[in-house]
UniProtKB/Swiss-Prot annotation:
It is found in: Cytoplasm. The keyword Cytoplasm applies. Pfam families: Ribosomal_L15e. It comes from Ictalurus punctatus (Channel catfish). NCBIfam families: PRK04243.1 (NF003269). Component of the large ribosomal subunit. It comes from the Eukaryota. Residues 169-180 have a biased composition (Basic residues). This is Large ribosomal subunit protein eL15. GO terms for biological process: cytoplasmic translation. Residues 161-180 are annotated as: Disordered. Component of the large ribosomal subunit. The ribosome is a large ribonucleoprotein complex responsible for the synthesis of proteins in the cell. The gene is rpl15. Disulfide bonds: none annotated.
Length: 204
């Protein structure tokens, strides 16, 4: 086994004494820093490389702190107006994961970079911490490499805002396997439209 395989196994056993101590110390360290800051290198190089990171020019890592918990409806004094069934303010759950929220914040802050992917690095009772991989699409090392040219195209601008990253697709219910049957056809709306469209086919 290579070194990265051993690192992967270490991160899988998060309840081991070593990892519990490391994660506690790191969470304390991350809490002292700002909510969004650049990391000098990936905390989990094995995970970052599996998600497409390379230790070369044009790749940037940002660490994002996201507050845990549900999403309160942003209404003044709890006045939602309308019918009582829609009066909920506090116990609402956001449709997207905190990881996709972290990607969005990193993408907003670094408007000139493209979000490639992200991964979990720690959490405590109040916050979750994610590291986001961003790519500088104007760097020659990215533009001249056939493997990374795809992300330089304009269609991939702010892909994190449109649910095109891995975390975003998961929240949209897109994927393979028995967990993702509701989105056969590309979206939640596609199978509904297919089932509810009357097709009177003419046979010759």
């Amino acid at each position: 086994m290579g070194a990265y395989k051993y690192m992967q196994e270490l991160w899988r056993k998060k309840q081991s004494d070593v990892m519990r101590f490391l994660l506690r110390v790191r969470c304390w360290q991350y809490r002292q820093l700002s909510a969004l800051h650049r990391a000098p290198r990936p905390t989990r190089p094995d995970k970052a490389r599996r998600l497409g990171y390379k230790a070369k020019q044009g790749y940037v890592i940002y660490r994002v702190r996201v507050r845990r918990g549900g999403r309160k409806r942003p209404v003044p004094k709890g006045a939602t107006y309308g019918k009582p069934v829609h009066h909920g303010v506090n116990q609402l759950k956001f449709a997207r994961s905190l990881q996709s929220v972290a990607e969005e914040r990193a993408g907003r802050h670094c408007g000139g970079l493209r979000v490639l992917n992200s991964y979990w690095v720690g959490e405590d009772s109040t916050y979750k911490f994610f590291e986001v991989i961003l790519i500088d699409t104007f760097h020659k090392a990215i533009r001249r490499n056939p493997d990374t040219q795809w992300i330089t195209k304009a269609v991939h601008k702010h892909r994190e805002m449109r649910g095109l990253t891995s975390a975003g697709k998961k929240s949209r219910g897109l994927g393979k396997g028995h967990k993702f049957h509701l989105t056969i056809g590309g979206s939640r709306r596609a199978p509904w439209r297919r089932r509810n469209t009357l097709q009177l086919r003419r046979y010759r």
